[in-house]
A protein has these predicted regions:
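Structural signature of hydrophobic alpha-helical transmembrane segments
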Residues: 41-54, 100-113, 136, 163-167
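Helix-adjacent hinge/juxtasegments
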Residues: 73, 81-109
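Juxtamembrane loop-transmembrane helix junctions in multi-pass integral membrane proteins
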Residues: 8-15, 37-44, 66-70, 98-105, ...
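C-terminal ends of transmembrane helices
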Residues: 57-67, 119-127
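N-terminal topogenic module of multi-pass integral membrane proteins
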Residues: 1-60, 64
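Alpha-helical membrane segments in multi-pass integral membrane proteins
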Residues: 109-120, 130-151, 158-179
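Cytoplasmic-side transmembrane-helix entry/capping segments in multi-pass membrane proteins
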Residues: 70-79, 132-138
Length: 198
């Protein structure tokens, strides 16, 4: 009788979530400083949207896919391509004159669909932690406020207020990402994430 050896494969890859959260968070803060009226839209925001908000999040999503994490895979890859699509919306009409720029109604529809997607993802965070609930909750509000602003042709005051709400969302994502890094390094809770009972 032959004894069959059982081989176990241990996953030693890093947790990609902090990369995704920080890519999202830093880019969101920088964009919403523009929305809040601190500076004009410029190449810095577009570069962050392509590189850290876009590519870095997509990489994090692919890494999470290998870990079998459906929620993180869906979130990071989706929002990574959101940033790339947002940059494309701004840049494409300038590169190809035949492409008409997005008007306020089409942008409202675009942002509302992302708000709907985020609202459903927000429900998933109730099985994760409070920090992610804040990130996805404030992001849901942000998308719908941006959509309302475009649909109604809201003035600068509304858009600036929306920008400050976006800053809250971005900083919440930065906190959540850095908390995961520091907690893992310390081997204990340094920055709480607010675990939920499952």
């Amino acid at each position: 009788m032959n004894d069959s050896a059982l081989t176990q494969i241990k996953d030693t890859t890093a947790n990609p979530a902090p990369l995704g959260l920080l890519g999202f968070g830093l880019t969101t803060v920088l964009l919403n400083l523009h929305n809040a009226g601190f500076y004009e839209l410029n190449a810095m925001i577009l570069a962050m949207g392509i590189c850290y908000g876009g590519i870095a999040q997509i990489i994090a999503g692919i890494m999470d896919c290998k870990k079998g994490n459906t929620f993180a895979t869906t979130a990071f890859i989706s929002y990574g391509f959101f940033w790339l699509s947002l940059v494309a919306l701004i840049v494409l009409p300038k590169i190809i004159p035949a492409i008409a720029p997005a008007n306020e109604i089409s942008m409202a529809a675009y942002l509302a669909m992302w708000g709907l997607f985020t609202a459903v993802m927000f429900l998933g965070t109730f099985r994760l932690n409070r920090a992610l609930q804040v990130v996805f909750g404030t992001l849901t509000v942000l998308f719908f406020l941006l959509a309302i602003g475009d649909a109604t042709g809201a003035g600068a005051g509304f858009k600036h207020a929306t920008g400050f709400e976006g800053l809250l969302c971005g900083f919440a994502a930065i906190y959540t990402g850095l908390a995961q890094v520091l907690n893992e390094l310390a081997g204990k809770i340094v920055l709480p994430l607010g675990p939920v009972k499952k």
